[in-house]
Structures are given as structure tokens and as C-alpha cells.
Swiss-Prot record:
Keywords: DNA-binding, Nucleus, Transcription, Transcription regulation. The gene is MADS29. It comes from Oryza sativa subsp. japonica (Rice). It is found in: Nucleus. GO terms for molecular function: DNA-binding transcription factor activity, RNA polymerase II-specific; protein dimerization activity; RNA polymerase II cis-regulatory region sequence-specific DNA binding. Residues 1-61 form the MADS-box domain. This is MADS-box transcription factor 29.
Amino acid sequence: MGRGKIEIKRIENATNRQVTFSKRRGGLLKKANELAVLCDARVGVVIFSSTGKMFEYCSPTCSLRELIEHYQTVTNTHFEEINHDQQIFVEMTRMRNEMEKLDGGIRRFTGDDLSNLTLADINDLEQQLEFSVTKVRARKHQLLNQQLDNLRRKEHILEDQNSFLCRMINENHHQAAVGGGDVKAMVEMAPVLSMLTAAPAYYGEESSSTALQLTPPLHAVDAAAAAGFRLQPTQPNLQDPGCSSSSFHAAAAGHGLQLW
């Protein structure tokens, strides 16, 4: 029973196409070898698959190069030899022309080479420069607005800190006044007052809405605290002769101090 005829057309299925290629390639190379051996013929076969892979066969009595040279001699055809030096020269010339063109454009934009420009070219150049200046100014204003926003945020933060510290000072003054001069509150507020006193040096000499206005100042608080009470050393030889023990205890009790 004979095989049915296969329609000669491209096989659409990739797997079937690859299988058919492998079978037909093997058969073709086998036939070429049989022809070269049986008939003492000079046979050369070069095959490229659809993926670009190369397969070749040449009869044992010669090389593929010899077959190609013989083919050129018989048909009087010659393959064009590639002159790499010529290709390099052409590429260098193209790059040199491109560099000169770019350099000329830079000189025109900087105003160093305007002698060869016509009136229309100068008008086009002017429009391009004005467009570039507009873009630069827009970017400049954007950066300035960002800096202003950052400064405003910092100002609000400093104002909040200033308000918080002022409230703390007022509350401690109020507690000290109600408690009859609470020395402990004054001592606790000393680091805060020192920090607030040093604030102008930290933020600079400029006057702003964030400057701290303190009432009373630190030296006034220290003077009031010193005038409100007087402590005597515990050792007898260091005590003030003019201050008796009873008066000392009374003064300490009046100011809310506990003696250990």
C-alpha cells in the first residue's frame, strides 16, 4: 500500500515543522553522501534552519571553500570583499560631521557664531532661547516656592514651641504664687529658663514672630528665689552667728522647706 502524497506547503505547527525538517535534512545529507561516494562527485550542501542553525556537508575529496572557489571560476562571479578600513573611514567621517554640527549648534546658542545665520535663522534661534528661558524661570520659581513652604512650616513649628514654653512658665509662676513661693517649682524651671534665654543665640539676632518674650527674666527669678529664703550650712562652725537655729527653722518652714 503506497504512501499518500503530502501537499507541499509551509507546515504551520512549529513542532511538526521541526520534526519534518530534521527528517528531510537527514535524508538530504544521506543522498549527498551517496552521490559523492558512488559517483565520485564533488558535492557541497549548506543548510540553515528557521532558527538560524547551520548544517553542512562536503564530499571527502575536497573542502567547501574549494567548491565555492570552483563555482566562482566556472560562473565568472566574485563575491564582494568587505573592506574594513573603508567602513571605518566612512564611519569616522560621519561621526566627525555630526560632531561639527553639534558644535556649531552650541556656538549659535551661546552667541559665538552668528555670522553665517540668515534673518530667518536668527528669528528661530531667538524663539528657541526665549522658550528655554521661560522653562528655566518656571523651574526657578518652583524651587523658590518650595523653599518658602519649608520656611513657613519651620515658623509654625517654632511658634508652637514658643507658645508651649510660655504656657509652662505662666503655669509655674501661678503655682509658685499660690503656694507662697514654691522653691521647688523655681528650681525645676531653671533648665527651661536657661534654654529660653539661649534661644536668641541659637536662632540668630534677627527679630521674628518666633522670638521668646519672657517675663520675668532668669536673673529676676534667681533674685526673687534668693531673697525669699536663706539656707545655713549644717556644720556649726560654718553657720552664720547672726542667724539662730530657731529663726532658721522658722524661715525654712515659712518657705515650705523640709530639713533632714
